[in-house]
């Protein structure tokens, strides 16, 4: 057991200021609400807080096609009508709209996950958190499901520089299809996704029979669930599967995507999980004492997203939080009871004991085929992308500092961050 985990937390106020559109369910403003709730509970004083670097196009192209990345850089609301063919090719439109500062938004959330992975690789922390990340649907050459750049894949690729095997766990209500697809043919990443499946629910993939191919056969695990699963059923299944996966696969690091749309009463969800039930997964994964990268994901009832990720930040810090939400810039959103925890829902649970048992049996049977962790011929670890040495005397105050200089500027108080009352607030 580690005596006390060292936590790195990544946040940039600009990431929550973008606007997908008036009727779009994705509200990045939820990230500002989460951050201010974390501040209100004083959790920032127990972590190392960093502003992430903006991911470079060359970093994004470690997974995504250069043409797609270049188009994301070029497109904006004013010129999008000039590129109807490219818009269709890259799946940009209603679900994945073009909005102001789209590429910078992608740079910030992807940069946070890449930075988190690098700090873990360099043993500068035990746990790294980027609630802005977790956009698991993005594909190599196109956007999907409100996701443009797949930060999770980029983070896992970083972790693979130092770890023979990485375990990816996804508790979003939607199948983690983009991450699974990226690593479907390799045994160096095991993907485990717990999600709603059936009834034409997006993205339509994630059947228990989808297990990977070639070298990756049996290294993709899908746990397809029906409407209404509750805390006890979900947590029992989660503990059984994840404990067996860790025992057999022996990962060097874990990436945990904590999509909050699996909570009860989510605008797009259909599960009955309480915040305690959702957070129990985080608590369980933390107990393995492996390098852990934690991200956000879906979540479309924004006040509950903020509640959930604040509670889970507390769990990662071994800090119990009082249920009464303290005063903060977004306090009005938590009316009328101003409680941190929300209970489970009351949708009929269609996941019968026999159904859950059959899913569990199939998954555990597949795991028998990989009783021994795969052996990996390790090559020389490639360096992180080159960032020029920082000369403090030559630093331009009008230009955002690079990652190395920002690492010297760790802050433990509120004033580091853009707030609604600041003159330069977003």
From Swiss-Prot:
Keyword Nucleus among record annotations: yes
Compositionally biased intervals (Basic and acidic residues): 397-414
The record's free-text note on cofactor binding: Binds 1 zinc ion per subunit.
Disordered as annotated region, ranges: 383-426
Cofactor section: Zn(2+)
Residues annotated as the enzyme's active site: 137 (proton donor/acceptor)
Biological processes, Gene Ontology terms: chromatin organization; negative regulation of seed germination; regulation of leaf senescence
Binding site for Zn(2+): 172, 174, 261
GO MF annotation, one: sequence-specific DNA binding
Compartments reported by the entry: Nucleus; Cytoplasm, Cytosol
Residue ranges, annotated region (Histone deacetylase): 6-318
Main subcellular location: nucleus
Biased composition (Acidic residues): 415-426
Protein keywords: Chromatin regulator, Cytoplasm, Hydrolase, Metal-binding, Nucleus, Repressor, Transcription, Transcription regulation, Zinc
The reaction(s) this protein catalyses: N(6)-acetyl-L-lysyl-[histone] + H2O = L-lysyl-[histone] + acetate
Site (Polarizes the scissile carbonyl of the substrate) residue list: 300
Quaternary context: Interacts with AHL22. Binds to farnesylated ASG2 in the cytosol.
Role of this protein: Responsible for the deacetylation of lysine residues on the N-terminal part of the core histones (H2A, H2B, H3 and H4). Histone deacetylation gives a tag for epigenetic repression and plays an important role in transcriptional regulation, cell cycle progression and developmental events. Histone deacetylases act via the formation of large multiprotein complexes.
Sequence similarity: Belongs to the histone deacetylase family. HD type 1 subfamily.
Protein name: Histone deacetylase 9
Taxon lineage: Eukaryota, Viridiplantae, Streptophyta, Embryophyta, Tracheophyta
């Amino acid at each position: 057991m580690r005596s006390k985990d060292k936590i790195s937390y990544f946040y940039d106020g600009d990431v929550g200021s973008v606007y997908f559109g008036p009727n779009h369910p994705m509200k990045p403003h939820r990230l500002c609400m989460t951050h201010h709730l974390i501040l209100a509970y004083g959790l920032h004083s127990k972590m190392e807080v960093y502003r992430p670097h903006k991911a470079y196009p060359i970093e994004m192209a470690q997974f995504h096609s250069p043409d797609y990345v270049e188009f994301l850089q070029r497109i904006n609301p004013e010129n999008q009508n000039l590129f109807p063919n490219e818009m269709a090719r890259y799946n940009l439109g209603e679900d994945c709209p073009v909005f102001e500062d789209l590429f910078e938004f992608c740079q910030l959330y992807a940069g946070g996950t890449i930075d988190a992975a690098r700090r873990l690789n360099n043993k500068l922390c035990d746990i790294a958190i980027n609630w802005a990340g977790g956009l698991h649907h993005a594909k190599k050459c196109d956007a999907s499901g409100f996701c443009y750049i797949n930060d999770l894949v980029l983070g896992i690729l970083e972790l693979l520089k130092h770890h023979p095997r990485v375990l990816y766990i996804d508790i979003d209500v939607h199948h983690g299809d983009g991450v699974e697809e990226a690593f479907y043919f390799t045994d160096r990443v095991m993907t485990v996704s717990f999600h709603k499946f059936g009834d034409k629910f997006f993205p339509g993939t994630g059947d228990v029979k989808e297990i990977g191919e070639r070298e990756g056969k049996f290294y993709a695990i899908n746990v397809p669930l029906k409407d209404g699963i509750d805390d006890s059923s979900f947590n029992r299944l989660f503990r059984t599967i994840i404990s067996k996966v860790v025992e057999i696969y022996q990962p060097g690091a874990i990436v945990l995507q904590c999509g909050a749309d699996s909570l009860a009463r989510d605008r797009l969800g259909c599960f009955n999980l309480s915040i305690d039930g959702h957070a129990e997964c985080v608590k369980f994964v933390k107990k393995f004492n492996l390098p852990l990268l934690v991200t956000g994901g879906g979540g479309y009832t924004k006040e509950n997203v903020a509640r959930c990720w604040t509670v889970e930040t507390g769990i990662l810090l071994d800090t119990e939080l009082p249920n009464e939400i303290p005063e903060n810039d977004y306090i009005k959103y938590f009316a009328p009871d101003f409680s941190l925890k929300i209970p489970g829902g009351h949708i009929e649970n269609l996941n019968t004991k026999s159904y859950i048992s059959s899913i569990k049996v199939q998954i555990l049977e597949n795991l028998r085929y990989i009783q021994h962790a795969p052996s990996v011929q390790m090559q020389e670890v490639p360096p992180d992308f080159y960032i020029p040495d920082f000369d403090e005397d030559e630093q331009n105050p009008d230009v955002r500092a690079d990652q190395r200089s920002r690492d010297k500027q760790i802050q433990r108080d509120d004033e580091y961050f853009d707030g609604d009352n600041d003159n330069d607030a977003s």
